[in-house]
């Protein structure tokens, strides 16, 4: 409730996209942190992620988000894996996402999800979560209404599935 939170999901390209968004926010003069497989930042420079886990366990994520808020961040960008979004593990269950970014989905992690449909459904939980809160937050001590929206790779065959998974506006992109 103290950060505008952007989640990024997809089979490939999550870490790069998280890094790009984080760097873009910083170039725009916004203080931001991020969590990805490779690195993380709680408001300062990026450091190596010692766990090398795409979406860490919920207590680790909450610790980083708390540190970001304490360090004066306005934004958090989180790499969100299908495992982390799955209701089985519920690693992201307590996060109020304001923006969801969908990169792509291909056949992967079927041993965990059991089917492609379940894999895609778990990834789309990011977009469903956009509808779960009112996006009223207190950022840097100020009450703000954070715009909520999705961003979808229109070249992916599952784009329409992700668009239909939220009531929020969705922007599309192509490469």
Model-derived segments and their meaning:
Residues 8, 15, 35, 61, ...:
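Residue-level signal for inorganic ion chemistry
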Residues 46-81:
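Conserved nucleotide-sensing/catalytic segment adjacent to the nucleotide-binding pocket
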Residues 32, 75-76, 169-170:
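Hydrophobic anchor at the start of a short beta-strand
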Residues 38-48, 98-107:
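Gly-rich Lys/Arg/Thr-decorated short loops/hinges at beta-loop-alpha junctions or inter-strand turns
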């Amino acid at each position: 409730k103290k950060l505008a939170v952007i989640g990024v999901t997809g089979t490939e390209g999550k870490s790069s996209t998280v890094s790009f968004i984080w760097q873009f926010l910083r170039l725009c003069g916004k203080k931001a942190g991020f969590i990805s497989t490779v690195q993380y930042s709680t408001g300062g420079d990026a450091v190596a992620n010692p766990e090398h886990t795409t979406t860490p366990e919920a207590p680790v994520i909450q610790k980083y988000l708390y540190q970001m808020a304490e360090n004066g961040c306005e934004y958090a960008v989180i790499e969100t894996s299908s495992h982390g979004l799955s209701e089985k593990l519920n690693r992201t269950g307590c996060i109020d996402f304001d923006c969801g970014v969908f990169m792509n989905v291909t056949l992967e992690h079927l041993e965990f999800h059991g089917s492609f449909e379940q894999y895609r459904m778990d990834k789309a939980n990011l977009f469903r979560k956009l509808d779960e809160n009112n996006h009223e937050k207190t950022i840097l001590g100020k009450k703000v209404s954070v715009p909520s929206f999705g961003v979808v790779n229109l070249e992916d065959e599952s784009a329409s599935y992700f668009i239909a998974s939220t009531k929020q506006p969705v922007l599309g992109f192509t490469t």
